[in-house]
């Protein structure tokens, strides 16, 4: 039974982690994912959610204040 618990934990962690280069769509636009509360300056650098995680958005790099 312990083996099943270990196997489940391993599979859970394997699927929970993301590949090394996550958020490809945001990075292709020259952006970076920031928490949604951050303000992108100028507003035109706010690309929206794109492929960022939940409650995060994509802003052009260096614009998150």
Swiss-Prot record:
Single GO MF descriptor: toxin activity
Disulphide bridges: 26-58, 33-52, 40-59
Keyword check for Signal: yes
Gene Ontology cellular component terms for the protein in this record: extracellular region
Any one GO BP annotation for this protein: envenomation resulting in occlusion of the pore of voltage-gated potassium channel in another organism
Keyword Secreted on entry: yes
Primary location class: secreted
Compartment list: Secreted
Signal peptide: 1-22
Alphabetical UniProt keywords: Antimicrobial, Disulfide bond, Ion channel impairing toxin, Myotoxin, Neurotoxin, Potassium channel impairing toxin, Secreted, Signal, Toxin, Voltage-gated potassium channel impairing toxin
Tissue: Expressed by the venom gland.
InterPro entries: Myo_ane_neurotoxin_sf (IPR023355), Myotoxin (IPR000881)
Family: Belongs to the crotamine-myotoxin family.
Function comment: Cationic peptide that possesses multiple functions. It acts as a cell-penetrating peptide (CPP), and as a potent voltage-gated potassium channel (Kv) inhibitor. It exhibits antimicrobial activities, hind limb paralysis, and severe muscle necrosis by a non-enzymatic mechanism.
Quaternary structure annotation from Swiss-Prot or TrEMBL: Monomer.
Protein name, entry field: Crotamine CRO1
């Amino acid at each position: 039974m312990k083996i099943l618990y270990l196997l489940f934990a391993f599979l859970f962690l394997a699927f929970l982690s993301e590949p090394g280069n996550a958020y490809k769509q945001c990075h292709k636009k020259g952006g970076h994912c920031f928490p949604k509360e951050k303000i992108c300056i100028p507003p035109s650098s706010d690309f929206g959610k794109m492929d960022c995680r939940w409650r995060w958005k994509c802003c052009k790099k260096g614009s998150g204040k």
